[in-house]
């Protein structure tokens, strides 16, 4: 990323000193993203202990995930509109999210009853969901000429959190009770709150924005205009279909490795780690390529490739070499498509509605993907193979729709930040998926 430092000051009027550098902005926001993923993934690792402590059924465990998805999905749309309005206070928004995150874990850690855990879960989900909005908007704004790469790096922060969490949390669980560990974990975000505020207190400020205060009605009008943008709505649909496939993929892949291939817990973990590790390497590369050659040139072959690999998984997974090879190949695209889709959406919108656009993307992904694990589960009960055909089909349909969407020509990194494509002033800002709930969050 360092190669473009000389472009960056165009859009970083507000940042002071060390906090002005491209490396600092990307590094800081990416690290924060990793913290959110680390904790969310750690809680999933602790799920058997939580289940036993509260005597939960499968429905009770599902209720925790549903609460997380509901809270993060519902808050994303109003959160996006408010984030765009509060642009000068993005540092405050990020710091508040980090504090709320710690508070949510504290509630979960000291909770004597199940309903209180749901409250903590909702707090955590809202904090993680809203963090993505200013963070990705800022990255998209500061790195508008290499938006795909910047958003991909942010995504990698989450993936690193996902990869490390099970190992560290599993190790610590051997030494202490789950609720003690969560209470200790909760202290970290509370301390980090101050660091986040110091680092990003000037993030959304710039000379232009200082003079404009957008009224709520004007912001709503600008937001409503997004729903009249046909290309944006189609990209949102593609992102939703991709979300449907993704949220069904990882849990049922884990079940498949257990049920059909009889792998041990350690072996399952190792196989799923292959996916993530390959993703960490390939995601920034794919983001960079999408900046250089265009979003569709990377996304469409990638989605078709995932579909084909998913279909091949069923007949070839009995051979351990083939299984590892297919998982590694899946990892090349499985995580990298989301930040590129986000970048493609942000390429189409103007200054001032980036966080709202991100909110729309998250909200639609939430609406579409909410039922997907249930559909996948019903198919899994009929025939394990059908679940994978369903996932492959979703990727195929998404690729076909994407093929039909005319996207603007990507401006290469040599161009000035403020010359947008599609005639929109390419100074827009953006947000990650978030897969917050799925994590992809």
Ranges and model annotations:
Residues 295-341:
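C-terminal transmembrane helical hairpin of 12-TM major facilitator-type secondary transporters
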Residues 162, 351-382:
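A late C-terminal transmembrane helix in Major Facilitator Superfamily
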Residues 120-158:
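Cytoplasmic helix-loop-helix junction between adjacent transmembrane helices
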Residues 154-204:
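Helix-loop-helix hairpin linking two adjacent transmembrane segments in secondary transporters
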Residues 43-47, 230-280:
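Extracytoplasmic gate region of multi-pass secondary transporters
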Residues 7-20, 203-235:
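Juxtamembrane intracellular "pre-TM" segments in multi-pass secondary transporters
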